[in-house]
Amino acid sequence: MTTLTARPEAITFDPQQSALIVVDMQNAYATPGGYLDLAGFDVSTTRPVIANIQTAVTAARAAGMLIIWFQNGWDEQYVEAGGPGSPNFHKSNALKTMRKQPQLQGKLLAKGSWDYQLVDELVPQPGDIVLPKPRYSGFFNTPLDSILRSRGIRHLVFTGIATNVCVESTLRDGFFLEYFGVVLEDATHQAGPEFAQKAALFNIETFFGWVSDVETFCDALSPTSFAHIA
């Protein structure tokens, strides 16, 4: 068992019965020219987040944790995105951006596109699981719950973008399904102003889970390994 220093209190878990969740580290969310950038969100400070996720993934894999990568998006015709009868049609900033800029139609969050791809620095390895998801929550219309329960996994460590949207949505849904969720705050990035990051982390540590950081996580898994990994 491993005890991780976190807010509001430490949490103990078995790494081999836990998963590291990497949420939507796609060009869409972390790279200039991707969806978030084109929709007017600031992605200029995502590079340190990518590096921190690399470090967390390396440590988690060495400790025997399952690594799950999410990719948010839809088919090329956007059927999976939902039509006017879906709130997603009206609230998705990707869909709204494409309606405002028709030349982008088929380029944002479409499976097979550059936008949909994971950033070059983050490459899933054999044994990892890569899951597409059609909405903010990684539990909605995906096999995530079944995958975790079949492996006896109850503790989830979250990284990725955006803290206040898909990361928080997935962690909240996990809370309702009796999963223990931890966010590594320096391995996440918000969509919107800095206060959105702070508010999401406040919500998580106060109501839904725990908040820690990459160095503390790596030290908890192997106290002597962090310097080597970094």
Curated annotation (Swiss-Prot):
Molecular function per GO: hydrolase activity, acting on carbon-nitrogen (but not peptide) bonds, in linear amides
Gene designation: rutB
Family the entry assigns: Belongs to the isochorismatase family. RutB subfamily.
Active site: 24 (proton acceptor), 133, 166 (nucleophile)
Native organism: Escherichia coli (strain B / BL21-DE3)
GO biological process: nitrogen utilization; uracil catabolic process
Expression induction: Up-regulated by the nitrogen regulatory protein C (NtrC also called GlnG) and repressed by RutR.
Keyword vocabulary terms for this entry: Hydrolase
Catalyses which reaction(s): (Z)-3-ureidoacrylate + H2O + H(+) = (Z)-3-aminoacrylate + NH4(+) + CO2; (Z)-3-ureidoacrylate + H2O = (Z)-3-aminoacrylate + carbamate + H(+); (Z)-2-methylureidoacrylate + H2O + H(+) = (Z)-2-methylaminoacrylate + NH4(+) + CO2
Function: Hydrolyzes ureidoacrylate to form aminoacrylate and carbamate. The carbamate hydrolyzes spontaneously, thereby releasing one of the nitrogen atoms of the pyrimidine ring as ammonia and one of its carbon atoms as CO2.
Ranges in a coiled coil: none
NCBIfam families for the chain: RutB (TIGR03614)
Domain of life: Bacteria
EC number(s) per entry: 3.5.1.110
InterPro entries (alphabetical): Isochorismatase-like_dom, Isochorismatase-like_hydrls, Isochorismatase-like_sf, RutB
Pfam families tied to this protein: Isochorismatase
The protein's name in its UniProt record: Ureidoacrylate amidohydrolase RutB
